[in-house]
A protein has these predicted regions:
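Bacterial N-terminal signal peptides
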Residues: 8-19
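Acidic (Asp/Glu)-rich catalytic clusters
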Residues: 43, 76-87, 107-123, 149-157, ...
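Catalytic-core region of carbohydrate-active enzymes that cleave or remodel glycosidic bonds
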Residues: 267-329
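Long, low-complexity serine/threonine/glycine- and acidic-rich segments characteristic of extracellular
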Residues: 387-395, 401-473
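Aromatic-rich peripheral "rim/lid" segments of glycoside hydrolase catalytic domains that contact
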Residues: 31-42, 65-77, 168, 302-307, ...
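Hydrophobic faces of well-ordered beta-strands that scaffold small-molecule active sites
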Residues: 49-55, 90-94, 123-125, 160-164, ...
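Boundary/entry segment of secreted carbohydrate-active catalytic domains
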Residues: 25-98
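Active-site cleft segment of glycoside hydrolase catalytic domains centered on the general acid/base Glu
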Residues: 69, 73, 103-108, 131-272, ...
Length: 473
């Protein structure tokens, strides 16, 4: 729910939703609530969470249009750098990537992905169905768009996730959620299958594929949604799903109000209902991880900034504490910066920063939580580094050797440390990633190893090595 546009529309029906049981005819064993409270739920251990955030400030909202305060890229990167612990992967979730925007949208998101991955972050894309006039219901057209997204973004090894469609179970808010459009369920199924097929075919091993679920609508609608995935997706769909995303906003959307600290129960209820009640309907078992793709708490009129910090800490620690219990591997906060801090509509105040980039108390809270709880493997999920060391020997006796670093990850290289045997030769920090080695003085009696230590954006590193031929006598 990265766009709080749905809040007012939900207000009229939330009371009915809250009163109804969360299971339905297609639930595994009748009515299914999951775990409504954290009390008594075991906190099983699990790997540390991979954290992230939505860096954009734009948020849709019901009511009069309020202009978004434009993003300032250098200040955004500076804020992210303050938030980001060293040697820790931080995933930036880029939302509102609409099929309707065509090539212009692809170009814009390619530029955003490059900006953030060049700075050392991982990127995840929310690939929206959101059709233009004349596209609605054209599932084959959306599938072609999804395949193109894979082909265009997959070569960037730091683009690690594609969320196909957005909140298809939510059907009354076309700006925020794809469920309002004809063919959305089929677009989800076919899009996930196509995205996974294309990543496998192209060998983009780092690129995972998932879809998300909005917590929550009425139980009958939820059972119908998950039953549709089962009946129309089947084993092919299940095999293509790497993860299922959860969008949950306790104290803002559902439930619309929580007492301070009650957000812990809200997160447990949302995660457990997804894991225990709904994923099994579609055949998505315990081996499919859950990503908390969107979780937030806005400030604004009657919503204090200190309360945001408290809610953030409560919700993050709940996900951390029960990650092993429910198989949660990832967490994303929505979002970094306010849409417009001068707006009287609280829906424009989701950020950890105000629109002038000054921090709210929650910024420091999230920074501290990342430092305490985040996964410490900067290369987690990325697969092997795609670099190679090429040598070209010059003509003539004892001619120099030209060495070049090549490969798909070459744009991510930040430094090369070059050595021959025990002797350090050079440190290279700029393109071209090439250097010349003079072989005079290398004894033909010895074997020499050329080693190049490549350090990449984000802290990853690898060593490339080749045997170096000495000059013949």
């Amino acid at each position: 729910m990265s766009r709080p546009v749905r809040f007012a529309a939900l207000a009229a029906v939330l009371a009915a939703f809250a009163a109804a049981p969360a299971g339905a005819d297609n639930a595994p064993s009748g009515a299914c609530l999951g775990d409504p409270s954290a009390n008594g739920v075991p906190m099983a251990p699990g790997p540390r969470l991979r954290f992230g955030i939505t860096p954009a400030g734009e948020a849709g909202a019901l009511g009069p249009a309020v202009p978004v305060v434009p993003d300032d890229p250098p200040r955004t990167l500076a804020a992210l750098a303050r938030l980001h612990p060293p040697k820790t992967p931080l995933v930036l979730r880029l939302n509102r990537f609409f099929w309707a925007d065509g090539e212009a949208g692809i170009a814009r998101f390619l530029a955003l992905a490059k900006r953030y991955t060049d700075a050392g972050y991982l990127v995840e894309l929310q690939v929206r169905y959101h059709p233009a006039a004349g596209q609605e219901g054209n599932v084959a057209g959306f599938v072609a768009f999804v395949r193109e997204v894979v082909d265009r973004f997959g070569p960037n090894s730091r683009v690690v996730g594609l969320q196909i469609t957005n909140e298809v179970n939510f059907t009354i808010s076309p700006d925020s959620s794809d469920g309002a459009y004809t063919g959305a369920r089929d677009a989800l199924i076919a899009g996930v299958i196509a995205a996974k097929d294309e990543t496998r075919r192209r060998g983009f091993r780092q690129l995972t594929v998932g879809f998300n679920w909005f917590y929550r609508t009425d139980p009958n609608s939820e059972a119908g949604f998950w039953g549709y995935l089962r009946d129309h997706g089947g084993p092919t769909f299940v095999a293509a799903v790497d993860w299922v995303g959860l969008d949950a906003y306790p104290g803002t959307v559902f439930p619309p109000v929580e007492a301070p600290g009650g957000e812990r129960d809200g997160m447990v209820a949302a995660i457990s209902q997804l894991r225990k009640c709904f994923m099994p309907i579609a055949g998505l078992g315990a081996g499919v991880p859950i990503h908390v793709e969107e979780n937030g708490w806005p400030t604004g009129p009657s919503r204090a900034e200190d309360s945001q910090a408290q809610a953030l800490e409560t919700m993050v620690r709940a996900v951390h504490d029960f990650r092993g219990t429910y198989g949660v591997t990832d967490y994303r906060w929505f979002d970094l910066r306010d849409h417009n801090t001068s707006s009287t509509n609280f829906q424009h105040h989701y950020g950890l920063l105000r629109d002038d980039y000054s921090p709210k108390p929650a910024f420091e809270t999230y920074r501290r939580l990342l430092d305490d709880l985040a996964l410490r493997q900067p290369d987690a999920g990325l697969g092997p580094v795609r670099l190679a060391l090429r040598l070209r020997y010059g003509r003539g006796w004892c001619a120099p050797v030209r060495a070049t670093v090549t490969g798909a990850d070459r744009p991510l290289v930040r430094r090369l440390d070059v050595s021959v045997g025990m002797r350090r030769l050079a440190r290279i920090r700029r393109s071209p990633l090439a250097f010349t080695i003079r072989r005079r003085g290398l004894s033909p009696r010895h074997r020499y190893r050329l080693r190049v230590r490549a350090t990449l954006a984000g802290g990853r590193a690898t060593t490339l090595a080749r045997r170096l031929r000495a000059c013949a006598r």
